[in-house]
Amino acid sequence: MSIYKERVSKLASSVNVDTVLLTEPVNIFYFTGCFIEPHERLLALIIDTKNEETTIMYPALDQEIVNETATVVNHLPHRDGEDPFRLLFEQFAHGQTKSIGIEGSHLVYERYMKLLDEYAAESIFAVDPAVNALRGIKNEEDKAQLQEAVDITEKALSDLTEAGVIGKSEKEIADFLRGKLKSYGAEDVSFGPLVLTGENSALPHGEPGDTEVRLGDFLLIDFGIVSESRYVSDMTRTFIIGEPTDQQREIYNAVHEANRAGIEAAVHGTPMKEVDLAARELIIEAGYGDYFTHRIGHGLGYGLHEQPSLDSENGDPLEVGHVITIEPGIYQTGFGGVRIEDALYIGEEGTHNFNKFPKDIDRITLDK
């Protein structure tokens, strides 16, 4: 049984509906091996849970991609001008569908209303938890592919530190990283890169601009790639430009210790809120609790932000196969910010840190 058929089988057995209708492209890739960006056109994977038969509905212009990559039983192309929902409902009728499972977090309102033309709201259910639970667990092959993505990311960052950053703008550094990532085989960037220097580094999700890196700055770089396997990476390092001041040293070391504590707490069976607490307590003790304004981490895989969510309210335990980030931060408006982010694989025998790029303050101080 292929990995895709195995995933379909697990989903079919975990939901209590006749038919699953998936429309999110990454979810469809997860269950078929076929990735299409449909834009405004309808892309859908239809899974008959009674016999696990799969049908992919797609824009006819993507026929070649589907033929080459999709591991599904039936193909249902639609041309511009055709009503894809007519074809969809015919497929549902063929499978004697009485109840439908959808991605409640993705299916747009207009398409949901189309479903209501034929089905009562009481027969439509969200299957997001089941899909997210499956995507949240990775195997050894997934782990190896994620490692390749992280290795490319770290190689580009090493090139940047060798080339030097002083006098370069945030945009110039972001462009440098994009070029290096492409040269090492990245399909695309997974976001950004976020390159923020000086006071801008206090913006957790700021955008790079024309501000140039100067002596005395924090330089925060958060970036990642989409690899050939479509797994993504996500890492953050914060550099200090020139000799650190006492305040910079204090803030950086507080975040570094919180990162270390979060990693040490992240073992299978540990409630996720305890991982958040382990890191957060150290930042609070250092006097910066009010400046750590987000959760400790999130899941990572084919999507940049997947389940699970490592926040202070999540009492679910970490499971073997989870891939998560640990990314504490301190952000002081008018001064600057520090975030350090690693990606981890939760294993049976221990936790694997995908990242090897240095974090010690002496190793992240740049003089050029």
Across the structure, where does each feature detected by a protein language model lie?
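Active-site neighborhoods and metal-handling regions in enzymes and metal-associated proteins
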Residues: M1-K368
